[in-house]
Amino acid sequence: MFNVQFDIFNFSNNITFLTLLISLISYWLGLIFKKIKNVFYIGYGSTILACITITIILGTRWIESGYFPLSNLYESLMFLTWGLLFSAIYLEYKTNLYLIGAIVSPISLFIVSFSTLSLPQDMQKAAPLVPALKSNWLMMHVSVMMLSYSTLIIGSLLAILYLVLIKAQQKKHSLKDFAFANLEFTFPKSTNSTNFNLLETLDNLSYRTIGFGFPLLTIGIIAGAVWANEAWGTYWSWDPKETWALITWLVFAAYLHARITKSWTGERPAYLAALGFVVVWICYLGVNFLGKGLHSYGWLN
Amino acid sequence: MNYIIKFLNKLNNLTVAIIILLAIALASALGTVIEQNKNTDFYLKNYPLTKPLFNFVTSDLILKFGLDHVYTSWWFIFLIILLLLSLTLCTITRQLPALKLARLWQFYTNFNTKAKFQIRFKTNSSSLTKLTYYLEEKNYKIKHFNHFVYAYKGIFGRVSPIIVHFSLVIVLIGSMLSTTQGRTQEAFIVVNQEKPVLDTYEAYVNDFKIAYNSQGLIDQFYSDLILETRQASKIQKTIYVNEPLNYSNITIYQTDWNIDNLVICIDNQNYYSIPLQFIELPNGSESKYWINRLDLFGQSVFCVVNDLTGIVYLYNQNKDLICISSLGEFITLNGHTITFNKLVASTGLQFKLDSFIPLVYLGFLLLMISTLLSYISYSQVWLVKNGSTTYIFGSTNRAKFAFIKQLTEIANQC
């Protein structure tokens, strides 16, 4: 029984790696060589496949260990990748914007290879939960936090892309010369087509994605606060992880408000979102390398 | 008074609000970089004046501005109060007035105005019915007027931000009250001994147990607890980590544990209770050790215990292991029989009196719902007939892309 599951796990791991590599190559081939358009379908398809295999990896772990697979760094990174891929698949379906897959596939491939190749074997094994983590809140708090991280990462990546493209445009490279130009979004041709250019699309898409990640982050932080209050009697203790989650929340709150300020159009909110990208990563990984505080479970023991 | 009004006017500005948010973020980050709540010597030693961190953080600066306790320093609390004021002002002077129907439903009389419509479409269809039907199908609410049709959807997206601000104010005020009015106390309670705790409460521990999993690691801590109030009512519950006892405004949490005494019997007649000392290992190891030196019949031995499973390790003065004994087992030392009878444990509990938890939780609940609903985009559409052509005007506050896509589709269907 154990052997069979181990094989499924290894097999899914290899397939994930392979499909993400294929997806990365096909998306970027499509971007660089404007003429071959069908590669995007290969990219999109393999992204979906990678998402499914990660679901299998996490699913077998869930069945094996009996609790939601978010107890160590490896599982948490895999879940983050799952969130990134899932959001990318959804957004791409909604907008037909292949740039999303093109930016999400390299970052996913990087995370997956880091977690399977660089993490020591014993850190990849599912470990029994310490008493403090034995709670239904684990699933609620950690999964919502992870989903919010992945949504916010995609949202802020789109904002960074927007900044890069706008800088390129300002440097007199017309966007037409840019390899991405063939992705310019056009509505069905008719008398009433509104020209919504790539930059505007990216800008609005990153706003909407962050706008969705933000309530998730709020719910995740609150679930953590309520859990902390149930487990050790205080809902806020300025633990580094908590504090950085709050900082992330504040930065994205500032971003969302900047969007509705008339004097803050265009680039300035995007800079805040780019700052948010850095802050999310500090919150998710950086804090744990300090090895202090209440959130140091399942990491570098 | 004038100054206050001027000050409040300055504060009532989105850019200022954004700066406050970022200032709190920066201050919070500072508190995770500089170690908090250490003694003065620590800062003098680690942040010398000669070698400032980031070229400006020195012990002088830290101590002067309370950077050793950022989150309770006067200026951090001042920032929080500024945020509270800014939230309240924004809600009263901007958000609530904007909720008036007249401002929500913008009935333009002249559609040539330069009002910012994201959409200005023209269709040749002469009837509004078809367009209205499509809009209704997309969940728009329709209002018919003499010369135009007004449609809107997503009103929650307009109302929710107000509730977000309101619930943040509740959470901030609630947690301020919690920290100033609430009380906590940590106590170790020896099994089978009564102990008075906070106010009129007394706690009694029937039993304390540690459950281990198959790999020998700690699975859970259980304290079988009785809480007695002055009214002589008794509440019994087995609490564990993540499962506290709640009664009225008191909550009791499982937080820690200790082994206090080892009961030893010599030659089957004399019983002694030996206090054990908890030893903290310098390398921050997870294992715990309790230790005591026994002088028995001219020989010194060290008893070492590291959990409640009842295994006692005996070492001689040269730190060599003499024997491993379990409770109740007879061992012989210098011709005497020794039995370890019992380990006396105590459970570390945290007692908390806080009447403002429900208020904070109410804020939490409202905040979760309202931030989620704030995602909704508030969209408005005007259909105006002019002879044989129909004009479609539209505006939305958040999902511009999806809105334009949707209306383009509707317009093309006609």
Curated annotation (Swiss-Prot), chain A:
GO terms for cellular component: chloroplast thylakoid membrane; plasma membrane. The chain crosses the membrane at residues 13-33, 39-59, 73-93, 97-117, 146-166, 209-229, 236-256, 270-290. Its main location: plastid. One of its GO terms (molecular function) is heme binding. The keyword Thylakoid applies. It is found in: Plastid, Chloroplast thylakoid membrane. The keyword Plastid applies. May interact with Ccs1. PANTHER family: CYTOCHROME B_B6 PROTEIN-RELATED, HEME EXPORTER PROTEIN C. Required during biogenesis of c-type cytochromes (cytochrome c6 and cytochrome f) at the step of heme attachment. Belongs to the CcmF/CycK/Ccl1/NrfE/CcsA family. This is Cytochrome c biogenesis protein CcsA.
Swiss-Prot record, chain B:
It comes from the Eukaryota. Its main location: plastid. Pfam families: ResB (PF05140). GO terms for cellular component: chloroplast thylakoid membrane. The chain crosses the membrane at residues 14-34, 73-93, 159-179. Keywords: Chloroplast, Cytochrome c-type biogenesis, Membrane, Plastid, Thylakoid, Transmembrane, Transmembrane helix. One of its GO terms (biological process) is cytochrome complex assembly. The keyword Membrane applies. PANTHER family: CYTOCHROME C BIOGENESIS PROTEIN CCS1, CHLOROPLASTIC (PTHR31566:SF0). Belongs to the Ccs1/CcsB family. May interact with CcsA. Required during biogenesis of c-type cytochromes (cytochrome c6 and cytochrome f) at the step of heme attachment. This is Cytochrome c biogenesis protein Ccs1. It comes from Guillardia theta. The lineage of its organism: Eukaryota, Cryptophyceae, Pyrenomonadales, Geminigeraceae, Guillardia.
